[in-house]
């Protein structure tokens, strides 16, 4: 008897709590975007001239926010609806969304824009300038306006040569055309990723900024409820409000979570899969708890690593957490963290360690997986080490750091 085959057959042919898992996919664009109405209003105001007075100006818009705050899905939805409204007004408008983390070079970005326009390029290798000229001529001949969203633009800024950034942002304006057909939306996690750019580039980009704050627990609940009850991701009555409330409370920014809608939806989907694996007709609170522990397995490993740190390593980590909480961005220059570390050390009555020792702390904690580091990139002034945390900061994470600091201080006073 083939037990393995029977096991697989049973699961494949068994009942499921899901109705349509596509609705839980990160790339899915829902009908509604709860708690992003204000951002859509701001985007509409920024692009009003494109619809009412097309060609009068080239619009630039920057969208900032942490991972999972709805930046990409809201921008995609806005771009598609703006295109629909323009067509109803007999205005030829196209929208292209480019992920700069996937399309990592200027050449690949221009190729993606061409594909988004369904534009056939010659088989021979083209330079970026030649590709841009073909795109521009295509828009001119067909009287088309184009909105380009450059998602994860901060990644492009940190890796691309300065001349490529300049080309992408400024070349169209240097053509000195009368009718402005190109418009840009830049999506970044933090505005500081642009602040070190050359002034001629930075001033051109940072004009209109729209902030996407982390979601509160009540907002996450509404998002999850929309996917379950309105979009019908799950079968009727298979997911209770208590399950949604639990996930929202765990991840809500006001409750010490990350405010990340993507992780919340992933947790809900995994809870459903666990229910299916147990042949349960409903998703229970226990399924949600199991899913939550699996979604963030790094936390348990980090807890063990944190307990191995000495006092000053813990103070440095606390400095990073405090900066993250206060400024709401992911990466900080090592010098800025060191300044906060010095302040905290003095508050604890400790003599701060020297600069070289701080670098050694960063090196060791990176090897332990407690922090991530990267260089500021060629598009920035100078080069410095940027430091971030590898997981969303929870109250459990903060409490553990504070507890371990207290233990080290007590031990040092006893000895």
From Swiss-Prot:
InterPro entries: AAA_22, Cdc6_C, Cdc6_lid, ORC1/CDC6, Orc1/Cdc6_arc, P-loop_NTPase, WH-like_DNA-bd_sf, WH_DNA-bd_sf. SUPFAM superfamilies: P-loop containing nucleoside triphosphate hydrolases (SSF52540), Winged helix' DNA-binding domain (SSF46785). One of its GO terms (molecular function) is ATP hydrolysis activity. Pfam families: AAA_22 (PF13401), Cdc6_C (PF09079), Cdc6_lid (PF22703). The keyword ATP-binding applies. Keywords: ATP-binding, DNA replication, Nucleotide-binding. One of its GO terms (biological process) is DNA replication. ATP binds at residues 69-73, 215, 227. HAMAP family: ORC1_type_DNA_replic_protein. Involved in regulation of DNA replication. Belongs to the CDC6/cdc18 family. This is ORC1-type DNA replication protein 2. It comes from Sulfolobus acidocaldarius (strain ATCC 33909 / DSM 639 / JCM 8929 / NBRC 15157 / NCIMB 11770). The lineage of its organism: Archaea, Thermoproteota, Thermoprotei, Sulfolobales, Sulfolobaceae.
């Amino acid at each position: 008897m083939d037990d393995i085959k029977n096991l697989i057959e049973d699961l494949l042919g068994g009942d499921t709590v899901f109705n349509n898992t596509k609705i839980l996919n990160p790339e899915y664009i829902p009908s509604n975007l709860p708690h992003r109405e204000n951002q859509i209003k701001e985007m509409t105001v920024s692009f009003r001239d494109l619809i009412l007075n097309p060609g009068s100006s080239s619009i630039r818009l920057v969208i900032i926010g942490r991972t999972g705050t709805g930046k990409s899905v809201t921008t995609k939805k806005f771009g598609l609806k703006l295109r629909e409204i323009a067509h109803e007004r007999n205005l030829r408008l196209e929208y292209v969304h480019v992920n700069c983390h996937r399309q990592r070079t200027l050449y690949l970005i221009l190729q993606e824009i061409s594909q988004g326009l369904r534009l056939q390029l010659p088989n021979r290798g083209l330079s970026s300038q030649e590709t841009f000229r073909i795109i521009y001529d295509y828009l001119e001949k067909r009287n088309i306006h184009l909105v380009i969203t450059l998602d994860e633009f901060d990644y492009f800024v940190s890796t691309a040569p300065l001349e490529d950034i300049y080309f992408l942002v400024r070349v169209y304006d240097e053509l000195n055309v009368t009718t402005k057909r190109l418009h840009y939306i830049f999506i970044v996690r933090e505005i500081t990723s642009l602040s070190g750019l050359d002034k001629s580039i930075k001033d051109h980009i940072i004009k209109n900024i729209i902030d996407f704050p982390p979601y509160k627990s009540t907002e996450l609940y509404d998002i999850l409820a929309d996917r379950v009850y309105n979009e019908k991701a799950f079968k009727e009555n298979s997911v209770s409000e208590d399950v949604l409330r639990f996930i929202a409370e765990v991840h809500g920014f006001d409750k010490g979570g990350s405010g990340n809608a993507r992780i919340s939806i992933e947790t809900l989907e995994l809870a459903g899969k666990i229910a299916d694996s147990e042949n349960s007709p409903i998703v229970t609170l226990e399924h949600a708890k199991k899913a939550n522990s699996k979604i963030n397995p790094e936390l348990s490993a980090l807890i063990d690593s944190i307990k191995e740190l000495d006092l000053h390593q813990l103070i440095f980590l606390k400095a990073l957490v405090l900066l993250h909480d206060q400024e709401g961005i992911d990466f900080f220059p090592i010098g800025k963290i060191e300044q906060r570390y010095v302040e905290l050390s003095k508050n604890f009555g400790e003599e701060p360690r020297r600069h070289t020792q701080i670098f050694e702390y960063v090196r060791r904690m990176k090897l332990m997986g407690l922090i991530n580091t990267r260089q500021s990139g060629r598009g920035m002034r100078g080069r410095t080490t940027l430091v971030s945390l590898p997981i969303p900061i929870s109250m459990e994470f903060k409490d553990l750091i504070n507890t371990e600091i207290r233990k080290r201080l007590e031990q040092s006073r006893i000895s």
